[in-house]
Each structure stands twice: as structure tokens, then as C-alpha cells.
């Protein structure tokens, strides 16, 4: 869905154009930005700059604060881990937002993800599943982050553990994630995450430095 913002002069701009000028701080544009946040949740798209602009407008206009939009923005930030989007969004929250129970729940979920306690995350996510059921692709976005962490942590991993870390998924879903990440089976119970060729190899580099190259510098130090 295309979102156009109508300016005071009667002309229209795209949201991206509006965010590039002083109009981003105009509270008259908040409703259309909030609608844009809802569309991101529905269509599995993401625009961090627009979402941060919404939180900034709430800072300037606390009487216009919308908690449901706040939840959606924070949860969408979680879908873009391991990037630091959530930290930036959290820094823009008002005291009344920070005191909100649902905001605290989302912050707790973020902390759990950041310390890679994925089993606990999925347990908490199940308890709070109504909070993000409107966000298309939420679970798969988290699984993408889990896959990233697994890929940087393990060389091989047991299938049952991998299924647990990915949210207690079934075998067919596991197969799709193995294929997506170019992992491989090893026997019946193991998945190879990193092969020998993937490992970082050390390399000795010898650089020849001529005396003439540093002579002038040494002279200055005398």
C-alpha cells in the first residue's frame, strides 16, 4: 500500500520524502505514520526510520501516545536482530511507555534473545502469543536470528537441540531451515553447521619495511 503525506501547500509526498525534511516532526502526519506501522506488521515489511520517527513524535506529543503502535514497533525491531534497532527504539520511549506492562514484557523478551536463551524465549512467546499474532512472519524472523547465532556458535549440533532452539518445530520445518541455511545432515542425529572449509584460517603476513620509509619519522622522534 502506498502512503502519501499531504503537505500544507496541498502537494503530496511519500513517507520517505517526508522523513527527509522538517515535516517529519509535524504531528499532523502521525496518523498516516501509525497506519504505515500497521501495514508493516501485516505485510511483513520493515522501515526503521519511519518507526523511530513515530516514537520521536510521541516524545514531542505525549498526549498522542498510542501504546498498541508502540508494541508493534518494538516487536518489529525484534524481527531485525542482531541489528541494534531495538536499543535505538527503547531509547526513545517515554517514562509512561517504560512503565507499561506489555512494554516490559517485550523488553524481557529482547533481553532473553540477546543472551541467546532461545528455549526460554519460545516458552515466554507461547504465553504471550496474542501480543504478536498480528505481526506476519514474526516467528520466522526470530528463527532467522536463532539460525544466525547457531551458525556462529556451533560446528555440529544435535537435531533435537536444533529443533528446540528453533521453537519446537517438526521435522519437515526443520528440513526447510537446514536447506535455507545450507547446513547438512551427519548421520541420523547431527546437523553440520560449519564445515572445515568454513573455519577461519590463520595466515602469516610478512611485510618488508625499508629503512628509508621510516627514517624521516624516526628523525622527528629524536
From Swiss-Prot:
Intrachain S-S bonds: none
InterPro entries: ARM-type_fold (IPR016024), CSN8_PSD8_EIF3K (IPR033464), eIF3k (IPR009374), PCI_dom (IPR000717), Transl_init_fac_sub12_N_euk (IPR016020), WH-like_DNA-bd_sf (IPR036388), WH_DNA-bd_sf (IPR036390)
Residue ranges of every copy of the PCI domain listed in the record: 46-208
GO biological process terms held by the UniProt record: formation of cytoplasmic translation initiation complex; regulation of translational initiation
GO molecular function, one term: translation initiation factor activity
GO cellular component: eukaryotic 43S preinitiation complex; eukaryotic 48S preinitiation complex; eukaryotic translation initiation factor 3 complex
Listed SUPFAM superfamilies: ARM repeat (SSF48371), Winged helix' DNA-binding domain (SSF46785)
Keyword Ribosomal protein (UniProt): no
Compartments, as annotated in UniProt: Cytoplasm
Signal peptide: none
Entry keyword set: Cytoplasm, Initiation factor, Protein biosynthesis
Protein origin, superkingdom: Eukaryota
Pfam families: CSN8_PSD8_EIF3K (PF10075)
Coiled-coil features, chain-numbered ranges: none
Family assignment from sequence similarity: Belongs to the eIF-3 subunit K family.
Record text on subunit structure and interactions: Component of the eukaryotic translation initiation factor 3 (eIF-3) complex. The eIF-3 complex interacts with pix.
Function: Component of the eukaryotic translation initiation factor 3 (eIF-3) complex, which is involved in protein synthesis of a specialized repertoire of mRNAs and, together with other initiation factors, stimulates binding of mRNA and methionyl-tRNAi to the 40S ribosome. The eIF-3 complex specifically targets and initiates translation of a subset of mRNAs involved in cell proliferation.
Protein name: Eukaryotic translation initiation factor 3 subunit K
Source organism per UniProt: Drosophila willistoni
Source taxonomy: Eukaryota, Metazoa, Ecdysozoa, Arthropoda, Hexapoda
Amino acid at each position: 500500500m502506498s502512503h502519501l503525506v499531504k503537505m500544507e501547500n496541498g502537494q503530496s509526498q511519500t513517507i520517505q520524502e517526508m522523513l527527509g525534511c522538517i515535516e517529519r516532526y509535524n504531528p499532523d502526519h502521525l496518523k498516516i505514520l501509525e497506519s504505515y506501522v500497521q501495514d508493516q506488521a501485516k505485510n511483513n515489511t520493515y522501515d526503521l526510520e519511519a518507526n523511530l520517527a513515530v516514537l520521536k513524535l510521541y516524545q514531542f506529543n505525549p498526549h498522542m501516545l498510542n501504546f498498541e503502535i508502540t508494541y508493534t514497533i518494538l516487536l518489529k525491531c525484534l524481527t531485525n536482530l542482531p541489528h541494534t534497532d531495538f536499543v535505538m527504539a527503547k531509547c526513545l520511549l517515554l517514562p509512561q511507555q517504560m512503565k507499561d506492562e506489555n512494554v516490559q514484557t517485550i523488553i524481557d523478551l529482547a533481553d532473553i534473545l540477546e543472551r541467546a536463551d532461545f528455549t526460554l524465549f519460545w516458552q515466554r512467546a507461547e504465553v504471550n502469543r496474542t501480543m504478536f499474532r498480528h505481526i506476519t512472519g514474526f516467528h520466522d524472523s526470530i528463527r532467522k536470528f536463532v539460525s544466525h547465532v547457531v551458525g556462529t556458535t556451533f560446528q555440529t549440533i544435535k537435531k533435537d537441540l536444533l529443533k528446540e532452539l528453533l521453537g519446537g518445530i517438526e521435522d519437515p520445518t526443520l528440513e526447510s531451515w537446514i536447506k535455507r541455511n545450507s547446513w547438512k545432515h551427519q548421520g541420523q542425529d547431527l546437523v553440520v553447521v560449519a564445515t572445515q572449509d568454513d573455519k577461519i584460517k590463520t595466515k602469516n603476513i610478512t611485510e618488508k619495511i625499508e629503512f628509508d620509509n621510516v627514517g624521516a619519522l624516526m628523525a622527528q622522534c629524536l
